[in-house]
């Protein structure tokens, strides 16, 4: 895929005339297309790594490196007066993980892809992650950490399941993120979301209605469990995740 062709198709401009945001989304389209061309690893058996969190970090640079085109893209941009490092700043970091468990899960997926093993990851598509820490008047405040945009590394799939709970059902939808192996094929990170999720439930800070499971299930990673409502919500999250994983497998 040719970056200039994608830029022209999207913006009608030359690379040198584009904003960093325009170039980021052009690189996103190019990288996703190249990942699709590489195809997935295959084998008689398949491994599924199921985790409540995947701390995958920003993906653009890592994917360009694993595709073997990082230096070429960097030079092309520099020749047009653009900085790849500055373009990378436009990318929001997926709010899908927080700590060691999430980083370990992400490393496993990287290894699976690079080693050419037939395996995928399964988790939840959190909209706001854990929280974003901001400081105002020397005081810490917790705010949502949104990352999902109209165009992102997420690819919506046709895979959907009806998950039964006591007294109600939830309709799930699977989204995929490609995890590129270094000079190898790709692994998929399958992320399940609730079709009825409602971001407007979130009020001041990261407060939200913990009882409305149909609308809140995938809003936050590790929602506050200092009360029974929060603890029950976490159980629902885990049940939803493993139920979808079982249906997928």
Spell out what each predicted region is.
Residues 1-249:
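A conserved ligand/cofactor-binding region detector
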